[in-house]
């Protein structure tokens, strides 16, 4: 399987893929997706990125202009102070390409017991000593995408040269204490398939990655999460271009596992976009499905979304409920 070198999601209405819509599937089973207690605030700092990863559900890249500004950031910080989440998750794009990130980390750190960031490994290997020092001082949990132990597979997905740069960045994080045994600095990996298939067992993948990274490069990490590629953004376009979109969605639907609903991240997380609007998850942000089916700005609310609130769904939700789920 080869992804295209570059891809852009076609505009216009979604194709009729002749599968039961996700919402209808839930209804047939007598299920309804609603919120539990919302404990995590996810903040998307923008779609600017130094790479054009070919599985990216946002189509992030160096030419994107959607970046959180200071006024919106202040609104988000005030909301975090009012609502007091158990965890705050910084994502993008590449969040480290937002020049306001250092200020945000310093402001958010006292407001939550668990501050997380999803940086780009290839950027962490390009200087950024000040940022790395800041992450260490504030005990920020680092989650990074490392989809494959195979150089060719990883670079098909993340671009030429990404493999050695990613390994070097992991070693650099280890040198600072992230992911090392006995350290309280947490480093987690995210792996996802490089083909149109479901991920392998997370337990087996974590064991395999741990052994190979340690043996080949003396790299350590805390946990690995094996996630399904969500059919949005560039990945959706590749599926469409290669004639696999219908089969992929059908595979996801056929592997629907109702037991995954209990732990879905959208039930305990609220996502805020770079322009300050709220979504049930980052995938719904990419799919333009606002929380409550209406545009609510972060400055308009004082508390986390209430338990029992309905969650906006679409067919991409099959990815989060297939087999072991995406939690």
List PLM regions with ranges.
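Short loop/turn motifs at secondary-structure junctions
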Residues: 52, 84, 111, 138-139, ...
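Generic structural signal for well-ordered alpha-helices
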Residues: 41, 77, 105, 132, ...
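Short cysteine clusters
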Residues: 49, 53-56, 266, 281, ...
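Radical SAM enzyme [4Fe-4S]-AdoMet core and its adjacent flexible, acidic
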Residues: 150-266
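Short, acidic, Ser/Thr-enriched surface-loop or helix-capping motifs
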Residues: 272-273
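Core AdoMet radical
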Residues: 40, 60-69, 83-98, 109-127, ...
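Conserved alpha-helical substructure of the radical SAM core
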Residues: 3, 7-92, 96-107
């Amino acid at each position: 399987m080869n992804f295209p070198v570059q891809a852009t999601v076609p505009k216009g209405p979604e194709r009729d893929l002749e599968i039961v819509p996700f919402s209808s599937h839930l209804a047939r089973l007598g299920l309804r997706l609603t919120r539990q207690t919302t404990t995590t605030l996810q903040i998307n700092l923008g779609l600017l990125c130094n790479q054009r990863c070919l599985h990216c559900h946002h189509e992030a890249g160096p030419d994107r202009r959607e970046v959180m500004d200071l006024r919106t950031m202040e609104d988000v910080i005030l909301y975090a102070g009012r609502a007091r989440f158990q965890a705050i998750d910084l994502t993008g794009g590449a969040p480290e390409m937002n020049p306001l990130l250092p200020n945000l980390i310093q402001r958010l750190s006292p407001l939550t017991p668990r501050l997380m960031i999803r940086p780009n490994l290839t950027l962490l290997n390009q200087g950024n000593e000040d940022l790395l020092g800041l992450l260490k001082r504030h005990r920020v949990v680092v989650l990074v995408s490392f989809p494959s132990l195979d150089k060719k597979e990883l670079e098909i997905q993340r671009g030429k040269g990404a493999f050695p740069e990613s390994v070097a960045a992991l070693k650099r994080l280890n040198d600072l204490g992230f992911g090392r045994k006995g350290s309280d600095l947490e480093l987690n990996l995210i792996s996802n398939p490089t083909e149109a298939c479901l991920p392998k067992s997370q337990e087996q993948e974590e064991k395999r990655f741990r052994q190979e990274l340690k043996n080949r490069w003396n790299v350590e990490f805390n946990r690995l999460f094996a996630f399904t590629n969500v059919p949005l953004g560039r990945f959706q376009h590749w599926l469409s271009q290669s004639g696999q979109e219908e089969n992929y969605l059908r595979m996801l639907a056929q592997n629907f596992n109702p037991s995954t609903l209990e732990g879905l991240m959208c039930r305990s997380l609220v996502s805020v976009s770079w322009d300050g609007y709220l979504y049930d998850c980052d995938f719904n942000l990419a799919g333009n499905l606002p929380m409550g089916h209406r545009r609510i700005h972060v400055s308009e609310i004082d508390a986390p979304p209430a338990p029992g609130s309905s969650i906006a769904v679409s067919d991409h939700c099959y990815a989060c409920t297939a087999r072991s789920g995406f939690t």
